[in-house]
Every structure is written in structure tokens, then in C-alpha cells.
Amino acid sequence: MLAGKTVLLCVSGSIAAYKIAYLASALKKLKADVHVLMTRNATNFINPITFETLTGNKCLVDTFDRNFEFSVEHVSLAKAADVVLVAPASANVIAKLAHGLADDMLATTVLACTCRKIISPAMNTRMFENPITQDNLKICEHYGMEVISPASGYLACGDTGAGKMPEPEVLLQYILKEVQYEKDLKGKKILVTAGPTREAIDPVRYITNHSTGKMGYAIAKTAALRGADVTLVSGPAEVEPPMFVNFVPVVTAKDMFEAVTSRSDEMDAVIKAAAVADYRPKFVNTEKTKKKDGDMAIELERTDDILKWLGEHKKDSQFLCGFSMETEHMLENSRAKLKKKNLDMIVANNLKVAGAGFGTDTNVVTMIRENKETELPIMSKEEVAGAILDEIFGIER
């Protein structure tokens, strides 16, 4: 995933330094070339040997270390780096970066880097909220560095508040955002729908379906990592919302209709991957329905057809993509839906095909356009997402 990419991890003195070992390991598993720089104070919290073992590269601390192959080390690393993450970033290191001080290996190297720089502050709440620290962070942002907001919680000093470094998985996502994909969708605005909806029968029960949201979330995440401005409208899904998207949670088909129709006009593309209820109970009981002898009938009524509305109101410059989950006559039914709903493309899959459908991490789909059909082999949902986005925006691989 990150083969050929060089990631520079800069670790300063903080109790959170140990978390970077997990991040370094995760990056190596993704085939990145990982280099670690440490301040002297950081070595009091974690041994450089740990990073050398995990990355296979020498961990640099001293600008004038004589035990390395001859090269101007801080310059050669700065040239090679595709992205730099300073984490944990102490108040002292942030001050150095803001004002261009270069008195150690870490600060010197970061100053020489021209690639994207990310800073993850970690310190006591009072230090973080100090106006001087806040001004320094604003200066860093002014010079193009991205600052990750610290989490709030119980701190090592015993205080509770802002100042915790986010978990390694969060830091990894920031790195992936910078280097995993080309930013070939930068400037594009995309609306994605995902997950199921729920239609209440009474305060206890509801009608829903087996959608987990995985496919829609994969599309939203991939589009965001490729630089798009993504709005994700989602029903109650079984997965965590991806980072870097505008997340709009909804519950019912009516909620989703309102959320989508109020936002669709400004979008370059709308990708409707949600499994929206076609029917809802006509009457919702205000109290729990009690079990009785004999059968019970629930009168249903149609919900608003979101995809039909989008097709009727679509701008000429807007791309509208729907999904079709079938159990039989997949191509015929999907072609009919493409035409009836005025879609530019429909992504069809058959629930009965192994590796496709709800809850899986893979999918088997056919992308259908008016004069073109592209059948994809079984792929991860992230790979399917990439193929869908390529087709929508005419990107050839």
C-alpha cells in the first residue's frame, strides 16, 4: 500500500512516545520506508533500539553522530521524505518549529523538509491552552503544517482535559491521507449515502435490512483520501465513520431524503450506496405492541424514492450513481433501473454470489452505463470503491 513511500517520524519527549512504536510497526506492514528521529528527552521514554528493530533503519538522535555512512544526514532524510509526522510534539518542539530553530537533529531535519508536515501536540492541558503554545500552533499552520487536535481525557500528570496524543490508528490515517493516493479528486464535491435505514413499528421494534454500510463507507473514505470534499449521509451502520468526511447521521428514509435532497445540488457526483427502506409502517404505535394470540398485520406505505428524485433534479454537469442489489435477473433489473431513474451509472451485485453483498469485506460488481458494462472480479470493497470512482471521473489506470 505504501511501497516506495518514505515516512519520517519525529518523536519528542512525552509519555506518549511509546505509541509511536505501534505506528512505526503499522507503517512497516504497509511496506513504507520508515525513519525515526528522536530528541534527547524522547530517549528517556523509549529506547531508540526499539525503533531500529521495528523499522530496520538507524534511529537518529545526534546531529553530529559519527557512526553513520557519510552523508549530510538531516538533508538526505529531508529530501527522501514523502511526509513528516512530529508526534508526540511537545510544547518545546512546537516552539522550535514555529520559529525556525534548528538546534538538534529533529528540528534541523524538519526545517529542511519540503514535503507535507503533520504535528500532533501532546502535553499538559494548561501548557496546550497557553496562549503562547496556541500562537505557535497557528504559526505552524500558517507555514503549511497540519495540526492534529489532541484528544481529551485523563493525562499522565493526573489532570483531565485536552492534551492527549490520538491513538496510533488515527495518526496512521493522517499519514495515509497524505501519501496513500494521488490527489486526483481534489476540488471535487461528492455525496455518498450508506448503511440501512430504520422504520419504527413502535418504541421497541423497527423494520430494517442487512446493510452494514461497508461499501458506502469504503467509497467515502477512498474519495476523501484522494482529495475530494466528501459528505457521507449514513443510516445506523455497523462500522465507524471514516475520517476526513462530513458525516451526516440519519435513521429513517425520511431523514435520509431530507439530508440528501438539501445537499445534492452543489455536488459534482452523488453515489447512492445506502439500502433505504422502500416501505414504512403507516401507523407507528406510541406504546410497545403487546404479543397476542394469532397473527398481526402491519399496514405499510411507500417511502420517498430518493434516487428517483435525484434523477429528476440532476444537473447536466452532475454524475449520479446508484446501486442495485439483486438475487435474480441482476443485469436486466439493473439496466431497467438505470433508465427509469435517469442514472449515469448503476453498480449491480448479486447477493447469492460468494464474496458479494452485505457484511463482507469483498464485493463482486458490474458497473453498468448506457452503452458500457464493466464486470469486476472479486475485490476488496476498498478496491471496488477505487474502480467506481475511476469510472465516474474518467480516470484510467
Regions found by a protein language model. Name each.
Residues M1-I118, N124-G213, Y217-R397:
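A cross-family phosphate/adenosyl-ligand binding-site feature
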